[in-house]
Amino acid sequence: MLIRPATPADTAEIDALLDTAFGPGRHARTASLLRAGATAIAGPTLVARCDDAAECPSAGPDELLGSIQFWPIALRTGRDHFSLTLLGPVVVAHPARSLGLGRLLIARALAVADAMCLGPILLIGDASYYGRFGFTATATGEWSLPGPSERERLLLRADGSLPRIADIVAESALARELSMVSVDG
C-alpha cells in the first residue's frame, strides 16, 4: 500500500469515494460547513493507493483506498481568534476496511501535522475511536458550531489551553469578518 500526500489530481477520486461512503447529504454536515471555501492543508492531507495486489487483492492497481484531509479553521471569542486545524473526513474504501488503513492514515497524518506544528486539531467523531490518538471532548463542551453536532463528538487534540467558551468558524468566514473590522475601523 502506498500512502502519499494528496495532489490536485486526486481530488475527483477523493470526492467520489466520499460520496460513496457518506452519501449525497455529506455537504450539509457541520464539518463540511467548516471546510467551505477552504483549501485542504498540503502535507498531512494524504491518500492511500493499492500498489501491491497481494496487499489489497480486492482492489485494482493504483486504486484509491483511502484519504484523510486537514483544513484551516478558527476559534473565535469576541475580537480574539485562534487558528485550529480540522481533521476530516477520513474515508476508507470498502475493499480496504479490514486492513487497519484508517488508523494508519490517521497516525501518519498526525505525525506530519505535528512536524508542521499545525497546533490544535479538531474533529467531529467518535471519542472511543479517536481517543487513542489523543482526542478528547474535555475542552470543547461550550464551543459552538455553524451547524448541528453532538457535544461529545466535538473532539480536540491540543497541548495548550484554549478559551472555554468560543465559536468555531470556517477560515473563510473569519477572513470576511476581519476584513470588515479593518474597513470599519
Model-based region annotation:
Residues I73-L87, R97:
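A conserved beta-turn-beta hairpin within the catalytic core of GNAT-like acetyltransferases
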Residues M1, A59-S67, T85:
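Glycine-rich phosphate/pyrophosphate-binding loop shared by adenosine-nucleotide-utilizing enzymes
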Residues A54, A93-L104, M116, R132-F133:
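Conserved glycine-rich acetyl-CoA-binding loop
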Residues A115-G119, I124-E150:
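Conserved active-site alpha-helix within GNAT-family acetyltransferase domains
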Residues L2-I14:
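A short beta-loop-alpha structural element at the N-terminal edge
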Residues T11, D19-P61, A74:
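Active-site rim helix/loop that mediates acceptor-substrate recognition in acyltransferases
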Residues L87, V92, S98-A111, L123:
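Conserved acetyl-CoA-binding loop-helix of GNAT-fold acetyltransferases
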